[in-house]
Amino acid sequence: MRERLLAAEKVTAIRWQGGALHLLDQRLLPSQERWLACDNVAQVAAAIRDMVVRGASAIGIAAAYGLVLALEERLAQGGDWEMDLEEDFLTLAEARPTAANLFWALNRMRERLLRLRADEDVLAALEAEAVAIHESDREANLTMSQQGIELIRRHQGNAQALLTYGNAGALASGGFGTALGVIRAGYLEGMVERVYAGETRPWLQGSRLTAWELANEGIPVTLCADSALAHLMKTKGITWVVVGADCIAANGDVASKIGTYQLAVSAMHHGVRFMVVAPSTSIDLNLATGEDIPLEERDADEWLDFGGAPAVPDVEVFNPVFDVTPADLIDVIVTERGIVERPDTAKLAQLICRKRLH
């Protein structure tokens, strides 16, 4: 399966080339495929904040490379680069507050700086760490893809119809994606007959990004309005909802794209299994429950313009980017470290704290 997934890889959103970070501008997809080159930390932070790059894993990877660019600039300026670099850590951390992987990646880069030997080239060491973060996410995607599809096979052996929401694919990660990685593996194994993708308002990640990714690989995909998803579960024989996550609290509550919570409620009502696929770096044991996860809200302007036509003037707008799905609505969380069915605090702590023999 690993070799087949590698051979099928067609989409990537992050490239580190020639000492610059190149990002596929996801705001323009699917009508344009334009790459944006970032050669300083301010550009990387802006790209994260403005959703040129999005998805928790991809944001973390971009931030790691952003620190490499920041260090290069600080070293060229002279002075106390270590103190100055703290400003760059803060700039990147504030770009998107909900993505757990962002803070994990920044902490890992900080820890690498603390482990520097006197004879090491600091810039080369930090660049190597960023590349390692990128590669480890790709490997995690491969592992999760295989684990997720084996779980689906275990519950029902024939080809199935799956529903996904948001975009948890190659565009949102350093590899094949989390939720879409499982779907890709399922299609290659003959386990997925059709994928239904919710449009995912207001940024339309489902219709612009997920449908584009799947169509690029020839995977049968049907796009649906968000308001049709409960009806879809009732009438189209959906067996699994498969989504990604931006942050997972210690008790298994999951912060994901706004609308995921109501999707989980509908899935529970219709007897459809609900799978969350995310790397273990999305789990933050310092957050006891979903109530502790900071949930980003974006500007009202995103809802006040409809194809160039303004909405009702002076109307108030509530524009949360994420919601929290309680753990008791989730059948399984799939990570590269293992699978957690019916997640709770004890199970997630065991997963994260488990000692590795290799």
UniProtKB/Swiss-Prot annotation:
GO term, biological process aspect, one: L-methionine salvage from methylthioadenosine
Xref: InterPro entries: IF-2B-related, IF-M1Pi, IF_2B-like_C, Initiation_fac_2B_a/b/d, M1Pi_N, NagB/RpiA_transferase-like
Active site: D246 (proton donor)
Pfam families, alphabetized: IF-2B (PF01008)
Stored SUPFAM superfamilies: NagB/RpiA/CoA transferase-like (SSF100950)
Keywords from the UniProt entry: Amino-acid biosynthesis, Isomerase, Methionine biosynthesis
UniProt-recorded Gene Ontology molecular function terms: S-methyl-5-thioribose-1-phosphate isomerase activity
Class of this enzyme: isomerase
Known catalytic reactions: 5-(methylsulfanyl)-alpha-D-ribose 1-phosphate = 5-(methylsulfanyl)-D-ribulose 1-phosphate
This protein's pathway: Amino-acid biosynthesis; L-methionine biosynthesis via salvage pathway; L-methionine from S-methyl-5-thio-alpha-D-ribose 1-phosphate: step 1/6
EC code(s) of this entry: 5.3.1.23
Binding site for substrate: R54, G55, A56, R96, Q205, S256, K257
Similarity comment: Belongs to the eIF-2B alpha/beta/delta subunits family. MtnA subfamily.
PANTHER family per UniProt: METHYLTHIORIBOSE-1-PHOSPHATE ISOMERASE (PTHR43475:SF1)
Job of this protein: Catalyzes the interconversion of methylthioribose-1-phosphate (MTR-1-P) into methylthioribulose-1-phosphate (MTRu-1-P).
Protein name as it appears in the record: Methylthioribose-1-phosphate isomerase
Organism: Pseudomonas putida (strain GB-1)
Encoding gene, per UniProt annotation: mtnA
